[in-house]
Amino acid sequence: MEVKPPPGRPQPDSGRRRRRRGEEGHDPKEPEQLRKLFIGGLSFETTDDSLREHFEKWGTLTDCVVMRDPQTKRSRGFGFVTYSCVEEVDAAMCARPHKVDGRVVEPKRAVSREDSVKPGAHLTVKKIFVGGIKEDTEEYNLRDYFEKYGKIETIEVMEDRQSGKKRGFAFVTFDDHDTVDKIVVQKYHTINGHNCEVKKALSKQEMQSAGSQRGRGGGSGNFMGRGGNFGGGGGNFGRGGNFGGRGGYGGGGGGSRGSYGGGDGGYNGFGGDGGNYGGGPGYSSRGGYGGGGPGYGNQGGGYGGGGGYDGYNEGGNFGGGNYGGGGNYNDFGNYSGQQQSNYGPMKGGSFGGRSSGSPYGGGYGSGGGSGGYGSRRF
């Protein structure tokens, strides 16, 4: 005879969730940013309710919103869902692809306002750059640390071709871009007892791609949606001093010598000419990521200037002139330079403009001004 549980008895899963969360419905140890997903490519018919109905299958949502034009109230083609814990975010990402209201959508880990200005912040890549690793750090140390995030395909600990000495950085490739997104959204990484800088590894083509997204539509700037995408109307990924445009990341003539891809500064002074990991020829040749010219940690102002990456957190900062000059990039996210929210003295303002005071501000494809995720103001 089947014994049914008494009415109202919590199921094991829901009980576990309650124990894991605080009184407010989420684990207080997990920042909201880590529990939030950006959902791109939404149908214009999708509402807050239909978005919630779909994504709450993988956990309890503490927030769900479809972003709309403040005047017309028309959907901008993207939204955000916030779960009660990171475990539920992982479950939703493992369930890809997602279809909402008959349309396949693109969920990604939400990028904070401060991180959205970094080159390639919204690009989909499967490789990370790991800087600041010491001589005693071996491949197995990197594998032991990063395999908890996802399946690793390759690990490359870069060495000097002639001496065989480690050059202080490595590349790790995963089988899923979401693993990379999850890693880079976490600010601090301690590997083999050393603080390390971890960011997306972008090729020259991917750096250029971050700037080339600007032309697909000129409206108010959806993320991969209709009417604007990553760029367009003056002040998004590409124009007016932002990703790839004049005075912006990877643009010609901006970025201050030594900032992300500006003019001949390369990738924050990793090298010259071009904006890949420091220069035309590639990782290890002249001007490259740690090459014989102004590379990573060599003389001439590479990653950390003359002192190399060892200057990290010890007053050396990144690139001799910091992130493009004019200030310090502290604690992986707070820029204390001369310009508002800029990584150095670049024209045209920071990506997304000034803070909108909104939890959704400062990200994907601002329409200029006080922009956030595709909007001037919320």
Curated annotation (Swiss-Prot):
GO terms for cellular component: catalytic step 2 spliceosome; nucleoplasm; nucleus; ribonucleoprotein complex. The modification Phosphothreonine is found at T124. Residues 1-34, 204-225, 336-378 are annotated as: Disordered. The modification Asymmetric dimethylarginine is found at R214, R216, R226, R239, R246, R286. The modification Phosphotyrosine is found at Y360, Y364, Y373. The modification N6-acetyllysine is found at K134. There is a cross-link at K4, K36, K118, K134, K151, K182 (Glycyl lysine isopeptide (Lys-Gly) (interchain with G-Cter in SUMO2)). The modification Dimethylated arginine is found at R52. SMART domains: RRM. It comes from the Eukaryota. PROSITE patterns: RRM. GO terms for biological process: mRNA splicing, via spliceosome. GO terms for molecular function: RNA binding. The modification Phosphoserine is found at S14, S43, S112, S116, S350, S358, S366, S370, S375. It is found in: Nucleus. PANTHER family: HETEROGENEOUS NUCLEAR RIBONUCLEOPROTEIN A3 (PTHR48026:SF12), HOMOLOGOUS TO DROSOPHILA SQD (SQUID) PROTEIN (PTHR48026). Plays a role in cytoplasmic trafficking of RNA. Binds to the cis-acting response element, A2RE. May be involved in pre-mRNA splicing. This is Heterogeneous nuclear ribonucleoprotein A3. It comes from Homo sapiens.
